[in-house]
């Protein structure tokens, strides 16, 4: 199967700090606007704040391997992670000052630069997925919930 580009939205990072390791051997694109949005949540004292801090730490450790702008291998057997800026024109009806639209502009640019590869916007934000689809981008939800079929595998709250 051909490698894909997954353009990751802020909502994914804020719900799962380990998401970078869940896209198999596909490449992950992080629009720089996502990093700005994640940074706004790092001081929160809840799971969103925790995930924001953890994803920043993950990215910092990857940064030590090489340039995030040029692309860094996430892990052995995993794809390349790259941080990009929005350099593409949005459709006229979309406000370029809205963060979600800046993220979509990054996805459009990746699609323009790689016409033979599948580019997928991954977001937990329903409206962002609807807009992405409306402007010709493939979009999918990020779902990490798993069903546990054995009660003994559930965390009891104590050791």
Roles of regions detected by a PLM:
Residues 5-120, 126-159:
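Active-site-proximal, substrate-binding regions of enzyme catalytic domains
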Residues 1-3:
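Non-catalytic pre-domain segments flanking phosphatase-related domains
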């Amino acid at each position: 199967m051909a490698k894909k580009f997954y353009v990751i939205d802020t909502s994914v990072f804020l719900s799962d700090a380990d998401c970078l390791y869940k896209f198999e051997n596909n490449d992950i694109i992080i629009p720089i606007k996502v990093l700005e949005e994640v940074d706004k949540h790092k001081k929160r004292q809840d799971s969103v704040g925790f995930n924001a801090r953890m994803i920043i730490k993950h990215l910092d450790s990857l940064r030590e391997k090489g340039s995030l702008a040029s692309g860094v291998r996430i892990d052995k057997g995993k794809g390349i992670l790259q941080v990009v800026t929005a350099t593409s024109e949005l459709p006229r009806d979309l406000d370029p000052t809205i963060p979600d639209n800046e993220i979509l502009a990054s996805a459009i640019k990746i699609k323009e630069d790689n016409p033979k590869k599948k580019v997928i916007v991954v977001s937990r934000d329903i409206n962002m997925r609807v807009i992405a689809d409306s402007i010709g981008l493939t979009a999918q939800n990020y779902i990490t919930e798993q069903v546990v079929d054995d009660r003994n595998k559930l965390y009891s709250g104590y050791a």
